[in-house]
Amino acid sequence: MNEEITLLAAAADPAATENIGWVQTIVLSIVQGLTEFLPISSSGHLRIISELFWGADAGASFTAVVQLGTEAAVLVFFAKEIWQIITGWFAGVFNKERRGFEYRMGWMIIVATIPVVILGVLGKDLIREALRNMWITASVLILFSLVFILAEKMGKKERDYDKLTMKDAIIMGLAQCLALIPGVSRSGGTISAGLFLGLKREVATKFSFLLAIPAVLGSGLYSLPDAFAPSSGQAASGLQLTVGTLFAFVVGYISIAWLMKFVANHSFSWFAAYRIPAGLLVMLLLALGMLNP
């Protein structure tokens, strides 16, 4: 899942780099689709795989633009719910008597998006450069796994979708800010917060996906100009970005369908069991000089 929202952080800086290749484009787009919605950090995996196999960081701008494909998958998968929220929100704006759950949900998503927008814009340089350090990514992969385990153990997992409140939305929105750090995972941060709040796994997961839509779409569009001629990371052509986005969409849709079924009967601790050895492996590769920090 960015995870994460490296997203609002992709602004330019004058240091041109090499062009991204087609194989790298397709592989990273598939990885983006597979990992965006799983709480294992999509931005972290893109950073690691790009460095390991191509010796270069594809960059925050490439990541943010390709994430448009995975967010399109969310729009298609949850099209019915999204349409109900949009129509319900507009209906409530113009008619107080029609202010039902969808109207409140619309405001929840809007309000919960504000923190990550502010932090993403104010901290764009820090996020694009310093926080993309591989040692940080590896450490966070391990440390944040403990949050998953605690959330599963402490969360009551009783509250349903129609019991969501503005308090839940604000807390999950603040948790979404953690995704600005590669390795945290946007979905991991927001879903864990939802579990701590007592939401059912399916509810926390669904709201996490809906909550990501404004921030990820906004960051992708914001990063689009820089992706063609980035200051940091590799440059991609319009065709490469288009193909990459399509790959991310298809794989992302499949990932959503799988995860929604998985969380109905399985603990998120399974993802912690993956993240910990993955983080340790990255640290080992860094120590051996096989990865650049």
Curated annotation (Swiss-Prot):
Q: Which cysteines are joined by disulfide bonds?
A: none
Q: Which residues form the signal peptide?
A: none
Which GO terms of type biological process are on file?
A: cell wall organization; peptidoglycan biosynthetic process; regulation of cell shape; response to antibiotic
Q: Which is an annotated Pfam family here? A: BacA
Q: What class of enzyme is it?
A: hydrolase
Question: What Gene Ontology cellular-component terms does the record carry?
Answer: plasma membrane
Q: Which controlled-vocabulary keywords does the entry list?
A: Antibiotic resistance, Cell membrane, Cell shape, Cell wall biogenesis/degradation, Hydrolase, Membrane, Peptidoglycan synthesis, Transmembrane, Transmembrane helix
Write down the membrane topology: Multi-pass membrane protein
Listed EC numbers? 3.6.1.27
Parts of the chain that traverse the membrane: 74-94, 107-127, 134-154, 209-229, 243-263, 271-291
Name its cellular compartments: Cell membrane
Q: Which reaction does it catalyse?
A: di-trans,octa-cis-undecaprenyl diphosphate + H2O = di-trans,octa-cis-undecaprenyl phosphate + phosphate + H(+)
> Has UniProt tagged this entry with the keyword Transmembrane helix?
yes
Broad class of where this protein is predominantly found: membrane
Q: Which GO terms describe its molecular function?
A: undecaprenyl-diphosphatase activity
Protein family per UniProt? Belongs to the UppP family.
What role does this protein play? Catalyzes the dephosphorylation of undecaprenyl diphosphate (UPP). Confers resistance to bacitracin.
What is the name listed in the Swiss-Prot or TrEMBL entry for this protein?
Undecaprenyl-diphosphatase
Phylogenetic classification of the source organism: Bacteria, Bacillati, Actinomycetota, Actinomycetes, Mycobacteriales
